[in-house]
Structures are given as structure tokens and as C-alpha cells.
């Protein structure tokens, strides 16, 4: 497995563009795992007409920049949280399909398992975009639990 990364300020800009570029110079499948806000920020990269069929994009769509839900202080009054997280109800379906992608929608484990064969098909003649819809609050809670578990493991390891 070869891993390439493009990380800008807060990781939002250029991820899709970089993935299109990596796929353009590779004969292997190239996967981009990206949040919805990052995807929508850079989705014009798919418009350039040079997207190869070896590109696989997995968009985690939780209705905005849910990573920001984990930041302290966002329980502020008013619209602060909405503006910081850029909450939305959008989907990547129309854009992906208009650019010739095979679009796959995932809302649960059953639809995820059904989509995996298409996502991993090396003989596909079109790039694939798999959009996974999740709940922002659940995502933030799972992230907190994950980092807490890692912290506890390190504490136990260092004893």
C-alpha cells in the first residue's frame, strides 16, 4: 500500500485536486477518503476532463464540517456553530454523475457491503464516488471515544 497525502490549512483545500493528479500518473487504483466539506470545497477538480477510471473517492457526508463539532467552545449562542461547521443538506450525487462517475450511496451497513464490489472493481470503465451518509453528532462522539481509548492504551503501555 502506498499512501500519498495533501494537507493544507485544516486539510480542506486541494485534496480532490491532488487525488485526481495522483490517479493521472498511476495505473493502480487510487483512493481518496475525504469529508463532505473538503469535497465540496474542491469538487471543481472533477470538471477538468482528465479524471481517470482508476480514481475512487469516498465522501463521508455528515452534513458539514463535523470535525469542528469536537472543538471546545462551539456551544456558543446564535449562529456561530452553523457558520463554523458550514452545515448543509447537499449530496455529491448530481455533480459526480454529471462528470461521468459511477455514484454509490451508502446509508447503512447493508448498502456499504453492496457497494464495495463496485468500489473495488479494477476493471471499471469510470471513476467511482461512494458517498457515505453519517450523523455529525454520532461522528463527533465516536471520535472522542476513539481518542480516549488511544490515550488510555498509552497510559497502560507506559506504566
Kindly label every feature range from the protein language model.
Residues 1-159:
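Thiamine diphosphate
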Amino acid at each position: 500500500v502506498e499512501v500519498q497525502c495533501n494537507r493544507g490549512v485544516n486539510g480542506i483545500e486541494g485534496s480532490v485536486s491532488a487525488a485526481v493528479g495522483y490517479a493521472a500518473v498511476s495505473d493502480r487504483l487510487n483512493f481518496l477518503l475525504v469529508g463532505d466539506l473538503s469535497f465540496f470545497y474542491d469538487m471543481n477538480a472533477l470538471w477538468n476532463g482528465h479524471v481517470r477510471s482508476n480514481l475512487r473517492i469516498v465522501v463521508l457526508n455528515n452534513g458539514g464540517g463535523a470535525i469542528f463539532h469536537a472543538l471546545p467552545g462551539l456551544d456558543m449562542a446564535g449562529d456561530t456553530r452553523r457558520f463554523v461547521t458550514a452545515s448543509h443538506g447537499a449530496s455529491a450525487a448530481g455533480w459526480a454523475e454529471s462528470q461521468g462517475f459511477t455514484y454509490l450511496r451508502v446509508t447503512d451497513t447493508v448498502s456499504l457491503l453492496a457497494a464495495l464490489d463496485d468500489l473495488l472493481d479494477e476493471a471499471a470503465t469510470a471513476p467511482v464516488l461512494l458517498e457515505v451518509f453519517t450523523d455529525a453528532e454520532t461522528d463527533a462522539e465516536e471520535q472522542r471515544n476513539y481518542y480516549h481509548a488511544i490515550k488510555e492504551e498509552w497510559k497502560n503501555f507506559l506504566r
